[in-house]
């Protein structure tokens, strides 16, 4: 038994799927990368996210980008992808331009 499976068993987590199914709502060309609006299912809940994929040949490293938690609950994934808010929070698009695949989900009760 792997360490991850054993830890999941100890703390009562559901088994981790090898692949996560998702739907793609839209794709936008952002010069050095594409930004896809996606939704995926986790524990019965749809999670909206942006998926930023660099152009060119991979493989590419990947990173999960979480947004800040503040009074602007209508901002979430869009702020870290440079669409709204504080330009200093726009690190998702900078990472995509640097060659990283970025997934930027909304936290519960933010944006969508």
Where are the regions a protein language model picked out?
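Generic structural hydrophobic/aromatic packing signal, biased to beta-strands
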Residues: 22-24, 38-40, 64, 95, ...
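Short beta-strand element of the alpha/beta-hydrolase
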Residues: 49, 59-70
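Predominantly extracellular/luminal regions of secreted and cell-surface proteins
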Residues: 1-6
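Cap/lid segment of the alpha/beta-hydrolase catalytic domain
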Residues: 66-112
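Glycine-rich phosphate-binding loops of nucleotide-dependent enzymes
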Residues: 7-19
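Residue-level preference for short coil/turn positions at secondary-structure junctions
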Residues: 58-59, 98
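N-terminal cap/lid segment of alpha/beta-hydrolase-fold proteins
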Residues: 16-58
